[in-house]
């Protein structure tokens, strides 16, 4: 059959072969867009269809020029077109944003997260198109090598002028930093990936200069200097610090449209949270990318772009909370029963100052829900290990990152479902029952921890809201969110980021703190310990009494019950201009500190 197909295509005229290629791309493109529209509800805008189709045709032409054989070119083009379009649609349904260049860096972590048929499918989506590409290229033709050199030189040349190139593309194809889904739909997937790849090149290749850092510090210093923590009494013992980051921990009772048969949260937690003023931490992420929540809670600077900071933003040794506490005599221990290298945690934890990192290999996996170790087992084993360490005379910074609570929220036979709903959403039903057990295991642990370490400082919070279905599906019936980030109200943007926060200040008990952006936690912890820390940890102090939650291309600002969402292309001159200059300065200093030359560490100290 292959030989007959070869004979048939070889006997066709050049015009016929090119006509077949163009017709195939048009038909296949239409089919894939139909699947994307009817299954994922994602499709380019009508005005973008011609340019998107033209980009796909250009890709097919390049492929055919390297092959000259339709029987190899057509399957290769089909595989790439399907993978690019459907993976983008799938990611939008899960996270509300399309595929970005940093997602390719994160692919190894995706493979570590998946198992069984899901892992096999993910590998196939990546491997099959590239395997077909290698088979497609006619390596024996001299013309192929000349074209390859030409294409490589062309790509290299564009990368050398990435700044002007992306500026031109922004002018032609538009760009909205806060609405990446809108970018994809107005450009098409191929143009979107090229445009954002060039932007990634510009962003990663240019770090702030000393003059730019000094100008940014001039904006940030007045707010930071006003923050002066009380010193701990001389000779007072150092208190242990326990930071508990709870996977997908959220107040599911807010799902009022789903008919929950009971409150998923343990009544003991509900009372503890009430004593803490029903405080919330404001997270930079939704449904995943826990590493960004970790970065903020440990390093004191916001994540403002749509990438995993541990992988693409944290390149330097940095004065984060673990390092600051280590210099004060603490033993920093991070515990997370996942694959050690997930989200680059081995390198990231080392760079921010943890002395010890316990991952899945350091725990007995004795109480699994699916592949996730229960919180009860994690708490017990971690405290046993801390209690048996050789340097028990040193205070400990105990950073606990739970794994139980990860989508798709499995429970084992020892944890039967206790809650029913009127909602047929399988993920939602699984999640509310998981929260029933997760909150109870937390409270059982807190009772023991507060008994054994009554003076310890305990900080616990959810890392992000749970994923409850494509397009924020689980939240729609309760009118908490809309299915498109671009259409969310100011209150919805707040809801998208807010998870429970409880801070127990030893014998003083829970503290009412209101809304605390996650990146403000390190300075708050040092304040409660009476440790000043380096000046840099105070630079994220916002102007006035504002709570500012940056998100990609926008930020939420709250002040005494008032709230405003400032979007980059839709700035309100009044409330937004007050914080915009501060945020841009903070981004400059953050890039310098964690990825650049660290000029900020050589700057003059804050004026007291």
Predicted regions and their residues:
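Transmembrane and membrane-interface helices of multi-pass
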Residues: 1-183, 608
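Short alpha-helical interface patches
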Residues: 95, 103-111, 123, 191-201, ...
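Membrane-interface transmembrane-helix boundary segments in multi-pass integral membrane proteins
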Residues: 111-126, 189-194, 427-435
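Alpha-helix initiation and N-capping motif
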Residues: 80, 104-107, 186-191, 210-213, ...
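Solvent-exposed soluble domains appended to multi-pass membrane proteins
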Residues: 224-232, 236, 243-246, 251-608
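A diffuse structural propensity rather than consistent per-protein peaks
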Residues: 93-100, 177, 209, 320, ...
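Membrane-interface segments at or immediately adjacent to transmembrane helices
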Residues: 161-243
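Membrane-interface micro-motifs in multi-pass membrane enzymes
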Residues: 101-102, 117, 184-189, 287-288, ...
């Amino acid at each position: 059959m292959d030989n007959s197909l070869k004979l048939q295509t070889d006997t066709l005229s050049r015009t016929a072969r090119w006509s077949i290629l163009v017709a195939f791309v048009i038909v296949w493109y239409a089919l894939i867009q139909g699947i994307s529209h009817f299954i994922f509800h994602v499709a380019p805008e009508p005005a973008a269809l011609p340019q998107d189709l033209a980009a796909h045709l250009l890709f097919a032409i390049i492929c055919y020029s390297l092959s000259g054989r339709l029987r190899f070119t057509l399957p290769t083009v089909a595989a790439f077109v399907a993978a690019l379009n459907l993976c983008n649609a799938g990611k939008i349904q899960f996270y509300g944003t399309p595929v970005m260049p940093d997602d390719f860096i994160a692919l190894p972590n995706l493979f570590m997260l998946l198992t069984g048929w899901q892992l096999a499918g993910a590998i196939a989506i990546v491997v099959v198109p590239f395997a077909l590409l290698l088979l497609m290229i006619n390596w024996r033709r001299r013309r192929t090598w000349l074209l390859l050199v030409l294409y490589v030189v062309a790509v290299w040349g564009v990368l050398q002028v990435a700044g002007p190139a992306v500026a031109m593309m922004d002018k032609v194809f538009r760009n909205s930093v806060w609405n990446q889904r809108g970018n994809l739909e107005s450009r098409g997937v191929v143009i979107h990936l090229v445009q954002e790849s060039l932007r990634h090149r510009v962003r990663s290749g240019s770090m702030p200069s000393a003059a730019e850092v000094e100008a940014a510090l001039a904006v940030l210093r007045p707010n930071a200097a006003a923050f002066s923590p009380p010193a701990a009494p001389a000779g007072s013992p150092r208190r242990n610090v326990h930071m508990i980051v709870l996977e997908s921990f959220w107040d599911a009772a807010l799902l009022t449209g789903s008919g929950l048969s009971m409150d998923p949260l343990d009544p003991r937690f509900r009372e503890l949270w009430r004593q803490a003023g029903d405080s919330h931490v404001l997270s930079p992420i939704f449904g995943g990318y826990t590493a960004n929540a970790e970065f903020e809670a440990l390093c004191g600077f916001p994540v403002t772009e749509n990438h995993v900071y541990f992988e693409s933003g944290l390149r330097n040794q940095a004065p984060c909370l673990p390092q600051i506490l280590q210099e004060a005599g603490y033993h920093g221990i991070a515990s997370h029963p996942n694959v050690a290298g997930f989200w680059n945690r081995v390198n990231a934890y080392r760079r921010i100052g943890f002395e010890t990192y316990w991952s899945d290999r350091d725990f007995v996996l004795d109480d699994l829900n699916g592949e996730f170790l229960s919180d009860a087992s994690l708490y017990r084993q971690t405290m046993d290990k801390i209690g048996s360490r050789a340097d028990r005379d040193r205070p400990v910074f105990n950073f606990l990152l739970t794994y139980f609570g990860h989508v798709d929220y499995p429970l084992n036979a020892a944890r039967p479902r206790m809650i029913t709903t009127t909602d047929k959403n399988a993920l939602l039903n699984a999640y509310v029952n998981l929260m029933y057990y997760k909150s109870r295991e937390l409270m059982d642990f807190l009772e023991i921890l507060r008994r054994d370490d009554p003076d310890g400082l305990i900080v616990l919070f959810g890392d992000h809201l749970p994923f409850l279905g494509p397009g924020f599906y689980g939240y729609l019936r309760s009118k908490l969110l809309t299915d498109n980030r671009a259409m969310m109200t100011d209150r919805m943007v707040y809801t998208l980021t807010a998870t429970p926060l409880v801070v127990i200040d030893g014998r003083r008990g829970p503290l009412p703190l209101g809304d605390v952006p996650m990146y403000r936690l390190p300075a708050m912890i040092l304040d409660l310990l009476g440790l000043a820390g380096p000046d840099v940890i105070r630079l994220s102090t916002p102007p006035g009494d504002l709570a500012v939650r940056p998100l990609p291309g926008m930020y939420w600002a709250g002040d005494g019950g008032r709230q405003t969402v400032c979007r980059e292309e839709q700035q309100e001159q009044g409330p937004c201009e007050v914080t915009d200059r501060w945020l841009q300065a903070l981004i400059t200093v953050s890039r310098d500190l964690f990825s650049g030359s660290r000029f900020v560490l050589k700057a003059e100290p804050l004026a007291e």
